[in-house]
Amino acid sequence: MIAKHGNNSSTSLSGSADLLQHAQPKAPVISATTNKTLPHIYDKSNYALLYARDWHPGMKHAAPIRKEVPVRTIFNLLGPLANPLQDTGMVECCVLGVARKDIGENFAEALRLGNARKALVVCGDENLDEVSCAGPTHCWYIREEGTSVDITKLIVAPEDFGLPRHPLSEVHGGKGPAENAKILMQILRGELPDDHPVLHFVLINVAALLVVSGICEADTSSMGAGDDGNVDKERGPGGLRWKEGLRRARWCISSGEALRQWEGFVEATNEHAQ
């Protein structure tokens, strides 16, 4: 199950909530995801967006001011740590992006103190709050080892996933949420070429979550139709199977499973909005 904590844009062209609200032919009703409806939504899909303005209603008072300030503020730091499910014990693992390398360790420590047991804080070498497709990504890996929870610093690059590097100029988002939503649907429908830079960018970030979850440590694989079961056991930075994460991420799209889960999310949220 995925619980994406997202919001409308304050300092960029398009936030995750903006993108989903512009999806075609039918958009999910993100405000319909509440603590009461979440169990039903997860019955229909393994994905949910937790709309920050609904789950943290007090924050709406800061939204107009944030839009007027042309730089990042403390809210850009608080948002990633404020997933409303984080303290419920429901979150098994997480990947959190930060836009400055000098605060990566602080975020990792905050997650550790918040009882995270499997997590990855990432910052691209360009101070990108994603796993970078252009070069190295600085990572702080939180994992439980016996009775302790340790933080390990490591660096991953696209080649650790078995992919080439792409300049960030090749994966720049659209001019607005509508264009970004169109790209999202092209990815989910498998309409982008296998070597498309944007697809590679998405795949390595999905793969990172799969790696941290621990599922890539399995020596067998039976995801469903189209899975040949050939687990990639090669290990990379941190002794982890980054290429196996990529293999599983590709299957999610090629099998149509990612699209089916998206459609389930759209259907469930629209049902609750009626």
Residue positions per predicted region:
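Active-site cofactor/substrate anionic-group-binding motifs, chiefly glycine-
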Residues: M1-S10
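Active-site-proximal loop->helix
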Residues: S9-K26
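Glycine-rich anion-binding loops and their surrounding alpha/beta cores
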Residues: Q21-Q274
